[in-house]
């Protein structure tokens, strides 16, 4: 189940992995494009052809019922809108149009309805990243996502770091850092939650057939932490950062 379907990629990948997929999105045009893309990539008669629905995910139960989708799901996997970082439409139901407090309220409703359709002893996975407000302060969106799932009774079980391509950040980051002391961000957080009994969930999955690197994972379904989080806080008005710290000067002998 994917309550924030967006584009076609997750549905197509699920089909290639022989997994039934149901994704919902508010945009009818987006869903039409998804179906056309899936037909082009997979063919209309492909087994496990993705199923996309159109509707408001804050009314997800009604959307699923209207489309004749019953029963519970083996997994939730989604990548939600990052509040108003990108506004997708002028539809008042579009949560990217809402202020942050309204966004979080609607976001939690969507997560709650999604989790109600997740089977016991199964996983929910969200790919998220933190976002800044108009003053440049982080909103703590990752933590709000964790709160939304644990508020539904799920266990926060795994956290992974998805490293994105640097692309144009290498060009932009020097001016950005000198002007605001904001570091360039090139990762997202993959948050994994477990519904039900952790022990029974572990026992319900077959072992992955990769030897030493996965011995710990097969025992507990826990990922190994290969990173530390470096959290930076600033006391005062962020507008004064450049004045307080000046520009960062790099020697010509060092890479730019």
Predicted region positions:
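Class I S-adenosyl-L-methionine-dependent methyltransferase catalytic core
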Residues: 1-256
